[in-house]
From Swiss-Prot:
GO function term, MF aspect, one: identical protein binding
Protein name, entry field: Growth arrest and DNA damage-inducible protein GADD45 gamma
Gene Ontology biological process terms, A to Z: apoptotic process; positive regulation of cold-induced thermogenesis; positive regulation of MAPK cascade; regulation of cell cycle; T-helper 1 cell differentiation
Coiled-coil region(s): none
Subunit structure: Undergoes concentration-dependent homodimerization, which is required for growth inhibititory activity and enhances interaction with PCNA. Interacts with GADD45GIP1. Interacts with PCNA.
Gene of this entry: Gadd45g
Length: 159
């Protein structure tokens, strides 16, 4: 029996529970940040915010469905955003269900369909006291994932 097999046997239930907890925390964080007006959605809009004020960004969500995996331009943007987030100590996760993300975040300002949700940044509001428990859970999840060399962990959002 190898170390990987031993480690894999011990962590499967723990890993599933950890992933479900992270998905629930992400759901709560998105709802809270959306209510506070702290979301920036869209690859290009997010790149602008990261370029202008990276210190104000606390969390990044990259989302791609299976059909998006073949989009080379999107994957290049993801790589650049990931590098920027890692360099600026911004926690980052991937989500594989853009439609579920759209259901959580909702429609855009005009009341129409949601725009580009492939990248969502969560920023600090102007209030210094904003401490979201879901953000703290996700930060811990990302830190634990990095200790396993998983720099951009994937999260499944709850139904």
């Amino acid at each position: 029996m190898t170390l990987e097999e031993v480690r894999g046997q011990d962590t499967v239930p723990e890993s599933t529970a950890r992933m479900q907890g992270a998905g629930k925390a992400l759901h709560e964080l998105l709802l809270s940040a959306h209510g506070q007006g702290c979301l920036t959605a869209g690859v290009y809009e997010s790149a602008k915010v990261l370029n202008v004020d990276p210190d104000n960004v606390t969390f990044c969500v990259l989302a791609a469905d299976e059909e998006d995996e073949g989009d080379i331009a999107l994957q290049i943007h993801f790589t650049l955003i990931q590098a920027f987030c890692c360099e600026n100590d911004i926690d980052i996760v991937r989500v594989g269900d853009v439609q579920r993300l759209a259901a959580i975040v909702g429609a855009d300002e005009e009341g129409g369909a949601p725009g580009d949700l492939h990248c969502i940044l969560i920023s600090n509001p102007n209030e210094d006291t904003w401490k979201d428990p879901a953000l703290e859970k996700l930060s811990l999840f990302c830190e634990e994932s990095r200790s396993f060399n998983d720099w951009v962990p994937s999260i499944t959002l709850p139904e």
